[in-house]
Amino acid sequence: MARAVGIDLGTTNSVVAVLEGGEPVVVANSEGSRTTPSIVAFAKNGEVLVGQPAKNQAVTNVDRTIRSVKRHIGTDWTVEIDGKKYTPQEISARTLMKLKRDAEAYLGEEITDAVITVPAYFEDAQRQATKEAGQIAGLNVLRIVNEPTAAALAYGLDKGDKEQTILVFDLGGGTFDVSLLEIGEGVVEVRATSGDNHLGGDDWDQRIVNWLVDKFKASSGIDLTKDKMAMQRLREAAEKAKIELSSSQSTSINLPYITVDADKNPLFLDEQLSRAEFQKITSDLLDRTRAPFQQVIKDAGISVSDIDHVVLVGGSTRMPAVSDLVRELTGGKEPNKGVNPDEVVAVGAALQAGVLKGEVKDVLLLDVTPLSLGIETKGGVMTKLIERNTTIPTKRSETFTTADDNQPSVQIQVFQGEREIAAHNKLLGSFELTGIPPAPRGVPQIEVTFDIDANGIVHVTAKDKGTGKENTIKIQDGSGLSKEEIDRMIKDAEQHAAEDKARREEAETRNQAETLVHQTEKFIKDNEDKVPADVKSKVEAAIAEANEALAGTDIAAVKAAVEKLATESQALGQAIYEAQGADAAASSNGAASSANDDQVVDAEVVDEPVDTEKK
């Protein structure tokens, strides 16, 4: 049986691991390192360099070296090299191809199957694009797994049967995730997850770069941001300084010949950066990790004291300020030191590959979807079919109907987010179900099904139950959710809960009124010869009042009109019932009597509860 590998495709570094005799082993690359920089360079001679060789030549080949492409995955971003445009998937595939080659060299056999990890807060387009990158690299992607979940799997598999609550704090090169999981008896279950797709070690590096640029400009008057080669050297020096400050109180940043002055004299950059200064210029970045942590605790419905262990993932968690913050947030809990933050995700991915291949027994991984999914229904309401933090894979269906008579098609708009009003959420995609046969409103039955697979990729199907006709969309367009969008979704959902509830109630009241008007008008038309004139005039007046209220903005008037119309409709039904009863008593024909009894049953439809229509 062909072997499967686990791959941590990171923003700044990537790792590949494989099971050897049931135990995960991190594979060293051809340069002898266990981590591979996620950097791709196109040399001028046509050669494509990946990893450390690409990083080594970045200063002299700035425009043709691509780094941190993971931040663009799932978007329409492209980079042009020699007249050809490359997508993030294609660049990521180059890194995956190198990892694949290194694993094949280590194992001495061809590799085709892989489990690839992504940040837990990656939305659908980003997951789909990651899978596509694997396919471009010649890999059969068995599963897309969330990074914190993989880390918990690697950490918790040998911890026995005792149930434990694990907090995974994952700060990588470009993304941040925090997840709460329960581990016990071979089951790894995600309780809640949150994060920021645009926060990572790169942002800390950039603050050092900005600090150096400002210092150099103040001393020499020269703006280094206009010099691409100088900026590349600054980026490399910043990363090195950040790493040194994790173990030292200060570091020296010395870059000779960084640029030249107006007289072509060479200039040197020589600065001392203390850990205190570094923490000061990056304090706001650190603070951005607090809100997702609090959100996860709230969503999981636990207190901080319920956390048994804290696992730090990602090289950026080596910064002392990060581990100090985690201690503060968890009430002084010491983060676990038994895992390598750079490698633990790949190890977990290899274990999951082993589970899928049958090499690892009695392990069940239960992941979740990070944000709610639903469609827009009548009144602009967001009807959620799948709530956030629902265990995946999952499938949910709900039946909707048309809003107008003889409506030939329905537009299905798929949204992701927490707000009650659809327009306030993120539109993932839309499609149309056409060919609905002419029918009165409320008659067609449209079944909408949301299916999230184990990779977290969404499929939506709309089916006309009457004709069997259906249409499907696999959500794969759109771009990644920015921090602002994610914050807005969750914060707005809390701040505007009352407003959203009122809007939803208003939409439901209006739908109810329209339905009652429609049903009553139809009932009068169908029973015109049986309706007493005085009763009919009262009902028609109530209908007119309801229509007038619906044309206005006063929801209280709509409610009052609905109540009045419901009362008059009931009187209408009662009048017809009594008239038919009198006819039956006067008749001596049993068959006629029986027929009239049937009509009595038909008339009772008025008393049935009115359902809110959705489209």
UniProtKB/Swiss-Prot annotation:
Phosphothreonine carried by residues: T175
Family: Belongs to the heat shock protein 70 family.
A Pfam short name: HSP70
Acidic residues bias spans: 599-615
Protein name per Swiss-Prot or TrEMBL: Chaperone protein DnaK
Region annotated Disordered, chain positions: 580-615
GO molecular function, one term: unfolded protein binding
Protein role: Acts as a chaperone.
Chain intervals with Low complexity compositional bias: 580-598
Induction annotation: By stress conditions e.g. heat shock.
Listed NCBIfam families: PRK00290.1, prok_dnaK
Highest taxon listed in the record's lineage: Bacteria
InterPro entries: ATPase_NBD, Chaperone_DnaK, Heat_shock_70_CS, HSP70_C_sf, HSP70_peptide-bd_sf, Hsp_70_fam
SUPFAM superfamilies: Actin-like ATPase domain, Heat shock protein 70kD (HSP70), C-terminal subdomain, Heat shock protein 70kD (HSP70), peptide-binding domain
Sorted UniProt keywords: ATP-binding, Chaperone, Nucleotide-binding, Phosphoprotein, Stress response
